Amino acid sequence: MLPELGTFLLVLALLVALVQAVVPLAGAQRGRSSWMAVARPAALVQLALIAAAFAVLTHAFLVQDFSVRYVAENSNSLLPVMYRYSAVWGAHEGSLLLWTLVLALWTGAVAIWSRQLPAHVIARVLGVMAVVSIGFLAFLLFTSNPFARLFPVPLEGGDLNPLLQDPGLIIHPPMLYCGYVGFAVPFAFAIAALLEGRMDARWLRWTRPWTNIAWSMLTVGIALGSWWAYYELGWGGWWFWDPVENASFMPWLVGTALLHSQAVTEKRGSFASWTLLLAIAAFALSLLGTFLVRSGVLTSVHSFAADPARGLFILVFLLAVVGGSLLLYALRAPRLSLGDDPRRAFAGSSRETLLLLNNLLLTCACAMVLLGTLYPLLADALGLGKLSVGPPYFGTLFVVLMAPLVALLPFGPLTRWQREQASRPLALLAPWAALALAAGVLAWFAAPQGHWKAALGVAGAAWVLLGTVRFLWTRRAAKGRKFTAEMLGMVLAHLGVAVFLSGALLVEALSLQREVALAPGQQVQIGRYALHFDTVEELRGPNYVSDRANLQVFKDDAPVGVLHAEKRRYASGGQTLTEAAIRPGPFGDLYVALGEPLGNQAWAVRVHLKPFVRWIWLGALLMALGGLVTAADRRFRRSPEIQDG
């Protein structure tokens, strides 16, 4: 009876969400405080119901209840217990339930930590979030019920996709969803402000830490996905411009613009329309990512099985939410009351102008990724044939758009609000620009064949790093040791950009790769490393059989270790999977992947040397840490002193 209980809990959650959406919004419109007061307890009850339903599904996986169709399709008696947990969200129905749970968690958190906001504001915010919950709960119950029964009950289940049987995939989807769904908070605030007809900059102070936390979680989620693809797929790459990778990257780009736009609106009263539109766009792109993953319209290693009914449901929901939000924005934004604030005017040479350029470049980059992702689909629909858009398009245009952004980045913190003499930040940064340029020239000559990406990566990273150092020096000279958490968070995030930039471009410029046939006793040379192919042995895991190659590693003729690369064959389904062997290091990885057997005891072996690849993920973690440090600023924890009404 537990599966039926799970369905019943979701039905109750849908009913509570309907109450949470209708009653508080109507109360805010009519000024009924008792109706508005329903929002908080309804949000917490909805969270409890969805969490209980999620616990029921988790229990079904742990006890291997194959009478539940979703469990029977994605688990079996050989699946290790650790992966039974990740199997809960390993396919369509469970991942959608996880999304709904994460949305309920964000809604509950807003209900608990928003006591300082006026009742009519929080009623509208929680009401809007409930509308989104209604859509996902209805989607679950009518097209994707994870508790649907299967009769007759099979004696054995299917299997979780072997690609997902990995510790990284236990963390990656929940973290990614926390980022995706977290943008529902600024989205709900934007819709609430449009419904209200005015936006107090002090309200915006309340939303900024929520946006920073969501953006940080999305950053970590994307980085975890990149790390997983690097070591699990056996290609040695860290980003493939896969459609679903792009689907998570687009809200990150718009979310980055939103972070900066919110700061301007809160501090200076400018960019209000930008901030509202970016808040809508960030969440709309998160919903678009959901559509791409679950509709089957795009091919991806991340996609779930195609289902036209599900795809149509999500598309209608997406159009309703996004179309309704943009219509409301078009009708209300031009008349939005912001009050009189002399700080809103700014000159062409000012920090506001630089941040406006930041917004434009990031949104253009997002539009470029969106076009490249959807163009093959549109071309096919219009009868133009099957087309593909690959890394050459994304890589070239992205560098063109990101280069000016990196060039402008150090100027922002050193430029004054409202009006600035252009010569001042130029004079402050000129010596540092010369040093960065010199570093790039040195990298050009040091790299094999003078690779331009090595020069660009070193020069760009040095420019951002030295510009950040110059800002800290200037700030300390002017203010002593006074640094707010918001400022330290900005510094960490900008340093993360420098580290990421150097890692991403250097690994592309300096990587080495060899594909060879090796038999026991043979060796291959790559860079300063020699790998001696010793033996291949057969091993048995809990639900797979593995051919494991043992390779002795020598660096400059000195032994430094042994690598074990595997080829696994899973018992259920017979799928074969490559498990790469990696010798990590702060300045580069030695990466070995075992290919197919070639006969006469020989195997195809791919060997990569990946300089500075780990700097990519270190940079992403620094950016995420910067967002969390900013969210912890004491200023955001003080009451915004907003008067009700």
Describe the function of each predicted region.
Residues M1-L9, G31-A37, H59-E93, N145-P173, ...:
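Membrane-interface interhelical loops and short amphipathic "cap" helices
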Residues M1-S33, I50-A52, F66, P243-P251, ...:
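Contiguous transmembrane helix-bundle modules in multi-pass membrane proteins
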Residues V11-A28, R32, S95-S226:
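A conserved hydrophobic secondary-structure block that centers on an alpha-helix together
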Residues Q29-I50, I112-S133, L195-S216, F240-W241, ...:
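Membrane-interfacial loop-to-helix junctions in multi-pass inner-membrane proteins
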Residues V45-F61, M129-L141, L278-S286, N358-L370, ...:
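Hydrophobic alpha-helical membrane-insertion segments
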Residues I50-E73, S77-L79, S86-A111, F139-R149, ...:
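Transmembrane-helix bundle segments that line or gate the permeation/cavity pathway
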Residues P174, V181-I191, W203-S261, W274, ...:
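Extended, hydrophobic alpha-helical segments in both membrane/secreted and soluble proteins
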Residues V516-R606:
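Soluble non-transmembrane domains of integral membrane proteins
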